[in-house]
């Protein structure tokens, strides 16, 4: 379905520079877009692509349109039509959502015959329950929820209105998922936290005893508009709940330990690991494969770059890095050799300083 720029602006705002009746039926990158597609410029370093794109129209910020120079109607190359908006990237995201919704007919409400639903569960008439879904006693499935094939919902768990669980996602007993959650395939919410008490006697080969499992009797509470990536795991609390606040976005294969609290609007990239009882503030950004130790607190607006390790609390907003970026292999070997010899170099410097001091050289 194609829409005019005028229709888009009525729905999403912005100003038109060019032909308001220009129609676009989809989105594409600047370097691949055709005359019936809408592109966007989010990074000024790609401004040259705007000049050469074949897109029917481009989403662009006012300052970037000024840099582009020529007026829309007077251009002889590149697009003649623009939607001018302060945040082209967010505008693009909303338009993309709209096109997806228009192209995807809603599934009919109902329960697939192969689903297993306990008589004590409550399932809204508007819910969509797919093949081989299991819903245990006391669970509540609210209006408009979609549970795809093989989803498991444990006893006493509530799934908020408008949420969508993709195939093979699982949410254990006693959890609360807020409205409009998106939970991708293979994600697990509410599995046991990693809690074991040591009960050992003796040392070495004479050591006896074992690890005693600590029952995890808390749950998981997830706020509205949260998205959880594929194969991500969020452990239930040991006594109190693990809490994911509103509008948190979690990538694939992330581990969140028991009793964590993730503040609203925080984003966590793939393969990050967050140990138990850690609190992360609001509007934080956690890079891919970052590791955060347990029992630490990150303040609001903290950014942890990819592969960084966090071993202590970081209460102040800012960007924190501990990862070593990739370099030429030979350079790495040289640096590693220097690191191994730092203690020897330190002792040599101390000896030289002492010798200079003995000779009065430090006064020179």
Swiss-Prot record:
Q: Where is the active site?
A: 258
The superkingdom listed in its UniProt entry is Bacteria
Keywords in alphabetical order: Acyltransferase, Lipid A biosynthesis, Lipid biosynthesis, Lipid metabolism, Repeat, Transferase
Recorded hits in PANTHER family, A to Z, give:
UDP-3-O-ACYLGLUCOSAMINE N-ACYLTRANSFERASE (PTHR43378), UDP-3-O-ACYLGLUCOSAMINE N-ACYLTRANSFERASE 1, MITOCHONDRIAL-RELATED (PTHR43378:SF2)
Q: Which reaction does it catalyse?
A: a UDP-3-O-[(3R)-3-hydroxyacyl]-alpha-D-glucosamine + a (3R)-hydroxyacyl-[ACP] = a UDP-2-N,3-O-bis[(3R)-3-hydroxyacyl]-alpha-D-glucosamine + holo-[ACP] + H(+)
Summarize the subunit comment. Homotrimer.
According to its UniProt entry, the protein's GO biological process terms are: lipid A biosynthetic process
Protein name as it appears in the record: UDP-3-O-acylglucosamine N-acyltransferase
- GO MF terms on file? N-acyltransferase activity
Origin species = Burkholderia orbicola (strain MC0-3)
Q: Name its pathway.
A: Bacterial outer membrane biogenesis; LPS lipid A biosynthesis
What does the UniProt record say this protein does?
Answer: Catalyzes the N-acylation of UDP-3-O-acylglucosamine using 3-hydroxyacyl-ACP as the acyl donor. Is involved in the biosynthesis of lipid A, a phosphorylated glycolipid that anchors the lipopolysaccharide to the outer membrane of the cell.
């Amino acid at each position: 379905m194609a829409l005019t720029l005028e229709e888009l602006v009525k729905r999403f705002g912005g100003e038109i520079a060019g032909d308001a009746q220009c129609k676009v039926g989809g989105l594409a990158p600047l370097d691949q877009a055709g005359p019936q597609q809408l592109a966007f410029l989010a990074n000024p370093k790609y401004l040259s692509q705007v000049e050469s794109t074949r897109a029917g129209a481009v989403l662009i910020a006012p300052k970037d349109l000024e840099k582009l120079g020529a007026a829309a109607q007077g251009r002889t190359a590149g697009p003649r039509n623009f939607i001018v908006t302060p945040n082209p990237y967010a505008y693009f995201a909303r338009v993309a959502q709209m096109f997806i919704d228009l192209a995807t007919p809603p599934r009919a409400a109902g329960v697939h015959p192969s689903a297993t639903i306990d008589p004590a569960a409550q399932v809204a008439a508007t819910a969509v329950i797919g093949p081989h879904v299991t819903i245990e006693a006391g669970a509540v499935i609210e209006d408009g929820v979609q549970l795809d094939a093989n989803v498991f919902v444990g006893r006493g768990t509530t799934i908020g209105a408008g949420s969508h669980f993709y195939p093979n996602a699982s949410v254990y007993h006693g959890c609360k998922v807020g409205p409009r959650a998106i939970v991708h395939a293979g994600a697990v919410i509410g599995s046991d936290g990693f809690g074991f008490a040591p009960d050992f006697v003796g040392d070495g080969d004479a050591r006896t005893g074992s690890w005693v499992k600590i029952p995890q009797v808390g749950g998981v509470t997830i706020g509205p508009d949260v998205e959880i990536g594929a194969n991500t795991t969020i452990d239930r609390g040991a006594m109190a709940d693990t809490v994911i606040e509103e509008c948190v976005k979690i990538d694939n294969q992330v581990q969140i330990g028991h009793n964590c609290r993730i503040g609203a609007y925080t984003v966590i990239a793939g393969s990050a690991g967050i140990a138990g009882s850690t609190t992360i503030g609001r509007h934080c950004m956690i890079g891919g494969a970052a590791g955060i130790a347990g029992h630490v607190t990150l303040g609001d607006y903290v950014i942890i770059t990819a592969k960084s390790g966090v071993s202590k609390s970081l209460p102040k907003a800012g960007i924190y890095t501990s990862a070593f970026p990739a370099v030429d292999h030979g350079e790495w070997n040289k640096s590693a050799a220097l690191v191994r010899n730092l203690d020897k170099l330190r002792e040599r410097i101390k000896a030289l300083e002492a010798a200079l001091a003995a000779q009065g050289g430090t006064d020179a």
